[in-house]
Swiss-Prot record:
Monomer. Belongs to the zinc-containing alcohol dehydrogenase family. It is an enzyme of class 1 (oxidoreductase). One of its GO terms (molecular function) is oxidoreductase activity, acting on NAD(P)H. It comes from the Eukaryota. Trans-enoyl reductase; part of the him gene cluster that mediates the biosynthesis of himeic acid A, a ubiquitin-activating enzyme (E1) inhibitor. First, himA, together with the trans-enoyl reductase himH, catalyzes the formation of apolyketide chain, which is then condensed with leucine by the NRPS activity of himA. Dieckmann cyclization and release from himA gives a tetramic acid intermediate as the product of himA PKS-NRPS. HimG then catalyzes alpha-oxidation of the tetramic acid ring, with a subsequent rearrangement to yield apyrone intermediate. This is Trans-enoyl reductase himH. PANTHER family: HYPOTHETICAL OXIDOREDUCTASE (EUROFUNG) (PTHR45348), ZINC-TYPE ALCOHOL DEHYDROGENASE-LIKE PROTEIN C2E1P3.01 (PTHR45348:SF2). Pfam families: ADH_N (PF08240), ADH_zinc_N (PF00107). NADP(+) binds at residues 46-49, 168-171, 191-194, 255-256, 329-330. Keywords: NADP, Nucleotide-binding, Oxidoreductase. It comes from Aspergillus japonicus. Pathway: Secondary metabolite biosynthesis.
């Protein structure tokens, strides 16, 4: 096929809040990669955190961006499950590969096949863009760290409960739905304004995380052997979740922030790597990305939540979207309109 003319929003150097739009890398997929024309790309906390204080050294200029939704334009030679023209979501992994071709904030991105899922025509691409990183991260917490049963459209009850701390967050929204599809009863936290949203995702009980007695309230409905996941990733939420796990007999606590220490001795905090399902535990990637997510979206049994807050205007607006998220949002995800595809 003819060479694709790409454009990208580049980070010119470390620790600067000014992206520059210019020619992007030419996509050249390996045998197991897919080239997606990006219609929408979501912004995640990693984007502004890497812009302000990078976790590790990178060669600049670089391109951020993890969540994309768009249309397949090219397939690697060994890709058989997909076809050109399909509407898909993709989890971009440039922070792992260190390759800008694998980043999301560009017109064409290259994504590994196991982290791509077809979406139904009924799901707008802008809404679908909120899903990739949240699905992968929630899947890593539930199926890698906690070893829960894989999700199913017809789950069997495990008789267990799981606390999703931060139920209206992006990761929390996916974690609630995956946990329900794995046969668990979900107990969640959220601000009072977001209780209805969290219940609509499948939580049977929702507690106000600001309530002084929230730990006591939640501990009263849990039993030893139940689970807790911190989907917020702050020192405060990690400490509260650790206390809760300790109160019900101890166990593993998946966290979105490196373990901070100071937790009860019977609690083992483990950092959740959102790229694990596509890199290491491929059985998780296959069960979630290849099987469950496409089927559940098509059947209307998985919601793309939280709702997108769409920023139109193309790649020139990526920095604006990053700045908006840096200031904070609630029960929304910032989504940039990269190109007009629908």
């Amino acid at each position: 096929m003819a060479s694709l003319i790409n454009q990208a929003a580049w980070q010119p150097k470390a620790r600067t809040r000014s992206l520059q739009v210019g020619p992007g890398p030419t996509p050249s997929p390996n045998e197991h990669e897919i080239v997606i024309k990006v219609a929408y790309a979501a912004v995640n906390p990693t984007d502004w955190k890497m812009q302000d204080t990078p976790y590790f050294e990178l060669e600049y200029p670089f391109i951020w961006g993890t969540d994309v939704a768009g249309t397949i334009v090219q397939l690697g030679s060994e890709v058989t499950q997909f076809k050109v023209g399909q509407r898909v979501i993709g989890h971009c992994d440039s922070l792992l590969t260190r390759k800008v071709t694998n980043a999301g904030f560009q017109l064409y991105t290259t994504v590994r096949e196991i982290l791509v899922a077809e979406i139904p025509d009924s799901l707008p691409l802008a809404n679908a863009a909120v899903l990739p990183l949240s699905v992968s991260t929630a899947a890593s917490a539930l199926y890698v760290q906690l070893d829960l049963p894989f999700p199913s459209l017809s789950p069997k009850s495990t008789g267990k409960r799981i606390v999703i701390w931060g139920g209206s967050s992006s990761v929390g929204s996916s974690a609630i739905q995956l946990a329900v599809a794995s046969g668990l009863e979900v107990v969640a936290t959220a601000s009072q304004a977001n209780h209805d949203l969290v219940r609509s995702l499948g939580a049977s009980q929702v507690f106000d995380h600001r309530a002084p007695s929230v730990i006591d309230q939640m501990a009263s409905v849990l039993q030893p052997g139940d689970y807790v996941v911190d989907c917020i990733g702050s020192p405060d939420t990690q400490a509260k979740c650790g206390e809760l796990v300790g109160r019900i007999g101890g166990g593993t606590l998946p966290v979105m922030l490196w373990p901070q220490g100071g937790l009860p001795q019977n609690v083992r905090a483990v950092f959740v790597n959102g790229l694990d399902p596509g890199m290491v535990n491929l059985d998780v990637g296959n069960a979630v990305w290849r099987k469950f997510i496409p089927e559940a979206l098509a059947a209307g049994k998985f919601q793309a939540k939280p709702d997108p807050r769409i920023v139109p205007g193309g790649l020139e607006k990526v920095q604006e979207g990053i700045d908006m998220l840096r200031q904070g949002v609630s029960a929304q995800k910032i989504v940039i309109e990269i190109s007009r595809s629908e």
